[in-house]
Amino acid sequence: MSYITRTGNLAEAPTLREGENGPYCYARVLVSDRIRQESGDYIDGPTVAYDVAVSGSQAANLVDTAQRCGNTRVTFTGAYRVTEYKGEQTTRLQHEVRADGVAVSLRGQSVTVERRKASDES
């Protein structure tokens, strides 16, 4: 398993769930890299969808932000694995990340920070 940090846009607002260990969500984050051509120009590379598992107060804050703000650019970091699924006609890759950290990116959007009471953290 690898460890990665990526930045991309939420595909949709994730749904907050409650488990034995507290709140969690699965966020789909779409990432496109810029690729430099031989001419020096840049083009958008293929979009890769990452299924990011987020837990605790980070999950609650991510869901709240996505519901209030819509399409949100986020940075995530965590353990990464790729799973290959073979169908009859195609092969599909699933990119999964168990996030240690999730943050709202400041690129192309403004952010307001509200500090929570220590009793609200998990």
Indicate residue ranges for each PLM-predicted region:
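Single-stranded nucleic acid-binding surfaces, predominantly the OB-fold ssDNA-binding core
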Residues: 1-122
